[in-house]
Amino acid sequence: MAKSAYESRLKKEYVERIRKAMQEQFSYANEMQIPRLDKIVINMGVGEATGDSKKPTVAAADLAAIAGQKPVITRARNSIAGFKLREGMPIGAKVTLRGVRMYDFLDRLINIALPRVRDFRGLNPKSFDGRGNFAMGIKEHIVFPEINYDKVDQMWGMDIIVCTTATNDDEARALLKEFNFPFRQ
């Protein structure tokens, strides 16, 4: 893939400021040990997909607008009779962001989307998995500016997983705080 001339604001901030701050805080022996963002995975599960097979397609279109990249339709792995679910039925959409799109999405998430969430008091600082990855959920996808509120017939939630190269939660928490993640006190 060709390298573009455009560099994201957050990527530039990471290279110029955040790496130095992380090096001072944790005093790594090697520059490659400094944690960085690896990828962001956005998953949108559509629970009502069993009744209407068009809903995952609509959710995927909204997710494509939010992420700026075409999502993959996720399908059920096995049948569950209680949920009227058959193996192979479309049940949601997911997208994996890396590189410039990842940093651009993170910028919009932190500065635009999270402040628009109703009754937002900050992200849970305990939502790390023990290996340096952070997971969060958003109940309404309309907080993103790419979604036209008037054209939305149904609101969906989404899971956002921020994967870092950090080896533990403390390093990942420090990295995300440097990116101005609004953690709860």
Swiss-Prot record:
- Which family is annotated? Belongs to the universal ribosomal protein uL5 family.
Report a single Gene Ontology molecular function: tRNA binding
Q: Give the protein's recorded name.
A: Large ribosomal subunit protein uL5
Q: Which UniProt keywords apply?
A: Ribonucleoprotein, Ribosomal protein, RNA-binding, rRNA-binding, tRNA-binding
The UniProt entry, under SUPFAM superfamilies, shows: RL5-like
Q: Which InterPro entries match?
A: Ribosomal_uL5 (IPR002132), Ribosomal_uL5_bac-type (IPR020930), Ribosomal_uL5_C (IPR031309), Ribosomal_uL5_CS (IPR020929), Ribosomal_uL5_dom_sf (IPR022803), Ribosomal_uL5_N (IPR031310)
Phylogenetic placement of the source organism: Bacteria, Pseudomonadati, Pseudomonadota, Alphaproteobacteria, Hyphomicrobiales
Listed HAMAP family:
Ribosomal_uL5_B
